[in-house]
A protein has these predicted regions:
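C-terminal region of N-terminal signal peptides and the immediate post-cleavage residues
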Residues: 2-31
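N-terminal segments that cap or nucleate solenoid repeat domains
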Residues: 25-71, 212-213
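Feature marks extracellular polysaccharide-active and adherence modules
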Residues: 44, 59, 65, 73, ...
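Acidic/polar low-complexity surface segments
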Residues: 69-79, 108-126, 143, 147, ...
């Protein structure tokens, strides 16, 4: 599943997408995200926003609304792509995919918008090869697939109640977590899957469904 998903990450959206709102305190993104610096970045309901290239700096937090898709970076382009301060906040988003970035302020990805739809036909969340300063919450996702790979997290990771269509989903591997790794209520249970990853290194405790990964 990992190889198939990686080949799908091609944005097919408008070329002009980042539109500053009143006072330029926030930017609404509905297509290709141009390299540059932004304050608060908002992906509105049902929109698609992203870039595989960068570099992008977000200083006031990233907010992904219901049914929206956000992509930053690519597994095939292993260079530092983004810096996000103020955290990542997603509520019932369709897909959130962040690669090779530094995130300060933690990650809160809650809920989903079902397994099918959006620019890729199927939905998935993945956080890969990031440095995350702050706790991570990935909870209640109802997409097709979800993964969490090779991240360095300065805080605890809470991975709960994610129900996926793909039996190879909920792959949580090769992370270094300076805190606890807490997992419960996921279907399927967090696993290696076909990722060829390694067990997570956790300085705190591994609890629940993640006690063996």
């Amino acid at each position: 599943m990992r190889k198939w998903i990686a080949g799908l990450v091609v944005l097919t959206t408008a070329l002009i997408a980042a539109v500053p709102t009143a006072g330029a305190s926030s930017t609404t993104c509905t297509g290709e995200l141009a390299p540059g610096s932004y304050h608060k970045l908002i992906v509105p309901e049902g929109a698609v926003c992203g870039t595989e290239a960068g570099p992008v700096t977000i200083r006031g937090g990233l907010y992904v609304r219901a049914g929206a898709t956000f992509v930053l970076g690519s597994e095939e382009n292993p260079v530092h792509t983004g810096t996000i301060r103020g955290g990542v906040h997603a509520a019932n988003a369709m897909s959130v995919q962040i690669h090779f970035s530094t995130i300060s302020g933690g990650v809160r990805i809650r809920g989903g918008s079902g397994p099918f739809g959006g620019p890729f036909g199927v939905t998935w969340n993945t956080l890969e090869d990031n440095v995350i300063n702050g706790s991570v919450w990935m909870t209640g996702y109802t997409g097709f697939w979800e993964g969490f790979f090779r991240n360095i997290v300065h805080g605890s990771v809470n991975y709960n109640d994610n129900t996926l269509v793909d039996p190879d989903g909920n792959e949580v591997q090769s992370n270094t977590i300076h805190g606890n790794l807490n997992c419960s209520g996921n279907d399927p249970a967090p696993q290696q899957g076909d990722s060829q990853g390694s067990p997570n290194v956790v300085t705190g405790q591994k609890t629940g469904q993640c006690s063996g990964v």
